[in-house]
Amino acid sequence: MDHHLQGTPAARREGRPTVSLIISTYNRPRALDRVLASVARQQEMPLQVLVADDGSGSETVQVVARWRERLGERLLHCWQPDEGFRLSAARNRAIREATGELIVFVDGDCLLRPDFVEAHQQVAERGFATAGNRVLLGQAVTADIEAGRQNPLDWSCLRWLMAWRRGDVNHALGLLRLPGQGWRRMSGRPWRHFKGCNMALWRDDIIRMNGFEEKIAGWGFEDTDLVLRWFNLGGRLKNGRFATTVLHLWHREAARDAAEENERRARLAGSRGATVAEQGLAQLADDDRPAPPGGI
């Protein structure tokens, strides 16, 4: 484990929203360990770090417990029993505990650059959700990262270009940052830009929409359902590219048996003007907060 904790206190800076960072995970403890290490290096620490756990076992519980020694009480483990792929429900459990003004969502296999939280704070604007982006890392370099043999967050620009030439990363300009805000405001309903591995919405907007639709189970399109309801509410997107980029560790593709039905359901909700999830935050029982096995 990295034994340093960087960043400024989580108190609200003038003009910047407080952030609750929600990290979704399921039985990938080594990846989660590296993600939490990247959280500890943030220049602007989030108010909260909430692990939205879809039923992981004891190894993940141990990872969270170890990092809580470094991150303190800001780190919360929001766990639910393993009853199949229920990402929407896992995220809703974390949203329920969130107190930050802005909620940033990432996957538990996405490394955060040191200015990630700060960049989301800077891009955030009322009336907009932020669509972040990702750089994909290859299988071999991912194995090295999870084993602690290298860390792409420490690479120089030259080393990054060499990694791209070798096929270890899929974007040569993955480290590039571009200033400005106006060009980030997207028009229309560009829902394909909104990816669950890196996105941000205002907490009060998510609550207005009743969170994620838990009727969408199995892999895929829970983020599409959310953003289409956001558009129906009158919301727009901002492009977080070249500011809020995450580094996405390699993994095998999940089973996509439910993808077709999930896409149909999400598109139907969008086309009929839905803004509120039928089964979401409001349907969570207040006392339904299961503890992880042997965890905190």
At which residue positions do the language-model features occur?
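N-proximal low-complexity "stem/linker" segments adjacent to membrane-targeting elements
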Residues: 1-41
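Conserved donor NDP-sugar-binding/catalytic core segment of glycosyltransferases
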Residues: 115-164
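Short aromatic/hydrophobic "clamp" motif used to bind/position activated sugar donors
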Residues: 103
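Glycine-rich, basic loop-to-helix element that forms the pyrophosphate-binding segment
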Residues: 81-98, 115
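The conserved acidic donor/metal-binding loop of glycosyltransferases
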Residues: 107-111
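Cell-envelope/extracellular polymer assembly enzymes that use nucleotide-activated donors
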Residues: 17-20, 48, 225
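A short, conserved alpha-helix in the catalytic core of glycosyltransferases
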Residues: 193-210, 217-235, 241-242
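Acidic donor-binding segment of Leloir-type glycosyltransferases
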Residues: 36-84
